[in-house]
């Protein structure tokens, strides 16, 4: 396990030839995987961008590899972080209760109330009035009604819907949807008062906690999230394009230092109930609160062990991302004014001159800025997956899994090339040249011939144009590609007629053989397409 991947990793470490790289080699040789995953470099310790990029790649390469045998209970770490966030939210709720109940007050509370009022006014300016009608939407993931593979649109349209008692007021609107109208007569709505906690892979040291919601709740939450997204766009914050803008701003700030990039630890899990209550109008709070789920359950096999939540919402709730964006935007604007503030989730960019006050304000509302991912001075900035040192992109390639198939090796080779191309050329940096060729050596010769541009993704090996294998016909260029996926299809006949009609009205496309594509499965029987 991992032998071939470690062979490639070792080539990168040897190619780097720095003390940090030597430390990585020593830890890997000793099997100290947890120490290897915890190894970090600090941008402030470097004067030259390339020196930092080399060492960062050395320590980052396997940091997110879920197959790294660290021996850590990844789900246990995620659960501990969840409970710690709940404890923090409990303290935040207790602190803000006196502002909601209007006393008892202490010294300095008049100024705090004034600032809370300023943030609240900014929130109200952003969100306006609540929507009168909800445009129910389905998410891509599972719900309490639709676990695992049974989470496609038609599956959701014929399962037993679930809803919390507090959300029953949306049923008259939901009843007008094709989903509700076409349910089978014997399908009943199930009342439920909890969500289910689960975790998904994040890196080699921990998982990320998520919550699985009741099906009608999540559909209504997504409707509210869509409405809030439109309100943010009206304020100049287009969440559909904001990541690219943040990366641009981070690059500029790494050169002139005019902006600071702020990142929060466990942001969505630390939005406390009382913070939302005090910052949003009564009408908005009642709507948001009615659609959230008040308790969570850790063990899906047991009815006991539920936890009454101190946080307002977390990952899995359909409006959490928009909600936290609005809160952080309002706090930042209350400090800095309307200009030069940009927020995308918990990625915050503010003028450097105001960042100290913004950090104090965030802490006041119970949030925890991450010291390791907040950059105020120096030549480094990070935001929305973009790392920049003096204007140069220095983001590492993260190998998230072991390489066990040609597709894995193509993906790793492409990842290294994407990060390590010398600016303005088709040449690889010498640090990873050997590692890139080792990746290609792991790929069968017939598949190795599939070369093409980056825009095609990992169905080709990204390479210089003169190495592409392609042909032109009728002004269309065809590339030889590796297609290792087959797509399982499901016959529409498996579903009740009402669910099929509702899915068609929702926009699910159908194949010519009266089936629809379910999901892709990587197979070892894939073969290169003809150019």
Descriptions of predicted regions:
Residues 1-207, 357, 421-531:
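C-terminal, non-catalytic extensions of nucleic-acid polymerases
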Residues 1-7, 178-345, 349-531:
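Core nucleotidyl-transferase/polymerase catalytic module
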